Structure formats: C-alpha cells, structure tokens
C-alpha cells in the first residue's frame, strides 16, 4: 500500500552522511510508489559545509518533492534566526496540504524535536531516527534532556543502530534496530569510467580535527604519487585554506580540488576512481563511513591507516580480497611503492557485496510504516 510520507531531515546542499541517507531513503521510497516530501532547511544555511554541486537530480520522479522555508525570519527580540520555528511552520503546512500520514525525521535536534511538536499538533505518525553526533553530543550529555526524552517517548517508532539500542529501548518499546546505512547498489553499479592513469581520491569535510583525520598525510602521499596517478581532493570546510597553505602552491596545483558533491553525483564520481583514501582514526565517534561503503560497493579500493578497517565493516559488507590496503603513513616512500604495486598488480576492480540488500532495507522501513496503522490528523481545519 502506497503512503504519503514526509521526511524532515538534513538534506542537500548540506553535506554529510545523514544528508546522503535522506536522499537515498526518499528516492527508494518514491521508486516503491510512495509519495515522498522532503522538508529541508533553507538552501543558504550551512556556511562552509554547503555543497556547490548540481542543484537537482537529473532523474525526474513525479512523486518526489522537496520543500524549504520560503522566507527569512525578520529581526526581533531576542535576536535569533528561529530556524526550528520556520521548519515547524513548514512541516505543519506540508502535512495539511498533502495529507501526510507519516513524518520521518533525521537528527534528534532539531528535526526530531520539530517532528515531536508536529505530531502533538496534528496527530501525524512520527518515526524518529538519529545520527551519531546528536546522540553523543545531546543525548549522552543530557543537553535539552526533558525535550529530548519526551520526543523519544512519544514517537510512534524509533529507528536506531545496534550500539545505541540500549539507550532508546527503555524509552520507547517500538524501537527498531537497523544498519545505519545501506547502499543502493543498483544506483552505484555504473561502468568503470577511469582514464589512462589510475585515479586516487580523498573525500571529506575539513573541520577542526582535519589533521587527526590524516588529510596532511594523505596529501603528502598524493604529492609523491601525482606523476603516476590522477589525484582529486573533494574537500571543503573551515580548514581548507589552512591545509592548502601548509601544502604550498605547487602541491595544490597538482590536484583537482572540487567542492562537495550532491549525493546523486557520487555514483558517477566513484565510477572514475580506482582507490579512495580513508584515514578516519581517531575520529570523534568513529562511525562506519557511508562514503567508504559506497566506494566498496562501486568496486573502488580503499587505502587506510587503520588496521581494524575491515573488522568495523564485517557486519554490513563482504569486502573482496585485496580491496583494502593498510599502510603506515610515516613510511612515505615505501608506502608509495606499495600503493603503486597494489593498484598495478593486486587489486582488480570488483564491487563488494552487502549483507543486507537495499531492497531488503527498503522493505524493512515499509514494514515499520505499515506497523503504525492508519493516521488520523487532528484539527487540521485550524490551519486552512
């Protein structure tokens, strides 16, 4: 049975794993015949972390819609841009105009909390999801704790991942455990489009811990390999000028430096890439990377400094033999030789397989929606 679903979440042009997950979930639901409405922030939010890629997917789906607040909040006392109120007002409007049955929200704050208020006002069924940083920075630290606990308790369903199940299950009996991200392998199954030279890439935001993510070490290796390989840094953020300054003008000119890409651009980009650098240790919360999963499922090799990389992914993906190369970044020349040998002789491009398929992932979400029963919107005449 097709449903009318609104997804209130982080979305393009904001970058990041949750924004990408929002797109692929919404697209998957639309392709299953559901009417899907994404409710997103104004396109000018996000500062340095706003993507400059293609504004809309080239694929046209007649049942896929995106809504954003149409105006800025005027200056008032106390001074605030009131983005959450703008999102709440828009959410109520979308629910009323499109008879939304299910409101599916991303991060706990602000989207989950806005969804909680929308449920209280309209009676819409609320499915609550979360990221990683919001659990670590809000829930575990008890920030906005009364509102957060009320949001979790009143949700019609909660979708979490295994490591956070014990946090949510005592608060909401209808808590479901899923893998945080499943790749739509059909969308990423593009033919290899690489050139004569092998192509190395790094993708990531450059924020306050860019040095701990190993971006300088990655750049050093790419500098040492640029005569043998094409090198691309898909990087953006508050630390971009700092890292470029530390590398010097000559090194910068050797790489391509595109800004962030939209989620729908990533399959085409990865079809041209032979190996992706993933230096994520130590990251603040060390999550499984959506991008690494997309790369693996596209047949891209992974170069990492983390010996436990494959173990982190073993529950979600079957990585091919020789698809991951673990290096010691301190051994610059030996590592450059190892990368050249690995790409030239050992690694043959072959997509990895997921242990949960994207169709099964979509079916699991539909089952959660079906379990909510019928929606009876409350007092919506008030908003006409």
Name each region found by the language model.
Residues 244-264:
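Nucleotide-activated donor-binding/catalytic signature segment of Leloir-type glycosyltransferases, i.e.
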Residues 210-213, 278-293, 304-313:
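Nucleotide-sugar-dependent
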Residues 6, 193-213, 219-226:
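Conserved donor-binding/catalytic core segment of Leloir-type glycosyltransferases
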Residues 11-13, 28, 34-79, 237-242:
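N-terminal strand-loop element at the rim of the active site
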Residues 84-87, 103-122:
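An aromatic- and histidine-rich active-site surface loop
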Residues 330, 343-378, 383:
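A charged, aromatic-enriched C-terminal amphipathic alpha-helix characteristic of glycosyltransferases
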Residues 40, 148-190:
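Donor nucleotide-sugar binding/catalytic pocket of nucleotide-sugar-dependent glycosyltransferases
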Residues 134, 178-188, 205-207, 240:
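Short beta-strand->alpha-helix junction loop in the catalytic core
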């Amino acid at each position: 049975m097709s449903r009318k679903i609104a997804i209130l979440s982080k979305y393009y042009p904001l970058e990041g794993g949750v924004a990408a997950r929002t797109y692929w979930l919404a697209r998957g639901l639309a392709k299953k015949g559901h009417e899907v409405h994404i409710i997103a922030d104004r396109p000018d939010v996000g500062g340095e972390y706003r993507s400059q890629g293609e504004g809309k997917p080239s694929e046209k789906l007649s049942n896929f819609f995106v809504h954003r607040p149409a105006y800025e909040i005027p200056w008032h006392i106390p001074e605030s841009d009131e983005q959450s109120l703008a999102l709440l007002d828009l959410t109520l409007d979308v629910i009323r105009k499109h008879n939304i049955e299910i409101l599916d929200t991303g991060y706990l704050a602000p989207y989950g909390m806005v969804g909680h208020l929308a449920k209280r006002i309209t009676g819409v069924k609320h499915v609550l999801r979360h990221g990683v940083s919001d659990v670590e920075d809000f829930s575990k630290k008890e920030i906005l704790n009364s509102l957060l606990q009320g949001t979790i308790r009143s949700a019609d369903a909660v979708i979490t991942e295994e490591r956070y199940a014990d946090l949510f299950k005592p608060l909401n009996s209808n808590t479901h455990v899923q893998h945080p991200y499943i790749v739509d392998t059909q969308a990423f199954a593009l033919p290899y489009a690489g050139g004569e030279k092998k192509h190395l890439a790094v993708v990531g935001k450059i924020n306050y811990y860019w040095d701990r993510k190993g971006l300088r070490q990655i750049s050093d290796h790419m500098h040492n390999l640029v005569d043998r390989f094409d090198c691309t840094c898909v990087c953006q953020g508050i630390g971009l000028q700092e890292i470029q300054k530390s590398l010097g003008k000559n090194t910068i000119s050797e790489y391509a430096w595109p800004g962030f890409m939209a989620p729908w651009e990533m399959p085409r980009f990865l079809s041209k890439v032979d190996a992706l650098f993933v230096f994520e240790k130590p990251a603040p919360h060390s999550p499984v990377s959506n991008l690494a999963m997309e790369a693996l499922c596209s047949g891209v090799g992974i170069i990492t400094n983390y010996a436990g990389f494959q173990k982190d992914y073993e529950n979600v993906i079957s990585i091919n033999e020789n698809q991951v190369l673990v290096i010691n970044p301190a051994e610059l020349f030996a590592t450059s030789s190892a990368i050249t040998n690995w790409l030239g002789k050992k690694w043959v491009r072959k997509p990895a397989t997921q242990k949960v398929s994207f169709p099964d992932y979509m079916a699991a979400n539909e089952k959660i929606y079906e379990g909510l029963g019928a929606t009876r919107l409350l007092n919506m005449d008030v908003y006409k």
